[in-house]
């Protein structure tokens, strides 16, 4: 059913693409719209893990993700190598355009189903990124780490900070799919959420 939802979404686009075209590069917005709509059955499929491995590939050494990536695409060798190289470009990690929060949730749902440690590790690294990126005053910059520019300003636009705080609340309340997280992470998430409220 989850895979059917993905195919149906693509098929109803104005371009009337073939069902298999969802594995080709699409506008990044397709990913952030589709990812939250997958049902639990989808995460039992090999396709879910293929996409999950792409998500891990694009995760940067900061623990965060760059924005505007269509994760379901089947990558060419050149795209794969470019993604590997970009892992160390720490200036691209962001919470803008639903980046990082979308990937954390996807990997958490995938881990719940597969129990594969690599997906759990991806989730934990992503959460640590959010915690490290928070300013002392409780806000989050659009990009972290970046030394200067508008990227380092607290990001209220596009609901970026709100999405982060909603995710942190789900984490410390241990709501699905975050039921597996250790208590120390939940405590850190609660503290970060409370700081965000005060910002």
Cite the ranges covered by each PLM segment.
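Aromatic- and glycine-enriched pocket-lining scaffold segments that form the walls
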Residues: 154-196
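Bacterial Sec-dependent N-terminal signal peptides
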Residues: 1-18
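Glycine- and aromatic-rich loop/turn segments at beta-sheet edges
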Residues: 18-26, 59-88, 132-152, 199
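Well-ordered alpha-helical scaffold segments within catalytic/enzyme domains
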Residues: 30-43, 51, 56, 101-116, ...
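Long, well-ordered core segments of solenoidal/helical folds
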Residues: 51-63, 122-139, 188-199
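Solvent-exposed loop and edge beta-strand segments that line ligand/cofactor-binding
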Residues: 17-25, 36-44, 85-100, 148-161
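Long, hydrophobic/aromatic-enriched structural stretches that serve as scaffold segments
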Residues: 83-114, 129
